[in-house]
């Protein structure tokens, strides 16, 4: 017998919850969409290129949401490896600039696969933020 009950329901919100809390001054909603585009370039070592989801965000997003560009805003762009985590103090500063603070509740979503919102959720956890 399997138990299909989701046990971490405090980290997932419903559209009803979001609608009820959309006017909360401490709520920040972020579109975290990123695309990995497969490339068949024999000259490149990378099997894919990273493409920001900003164009998708510009076309449509949850009202009041802001956009987080994972690769450009929250990753070490000097690293030879994609999506390398920033140093904790730099990451905290970047998150603060996005309006994420001690009393903030952050809702993260991706328009494609959930891994991008999940990645940013984990980054928030690395600096001790647990209200996402």
Report residues per predicted region.
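Cytosolic catalytic domains that perform sulfur/thiol-centered chemistry
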Residues: 1-132
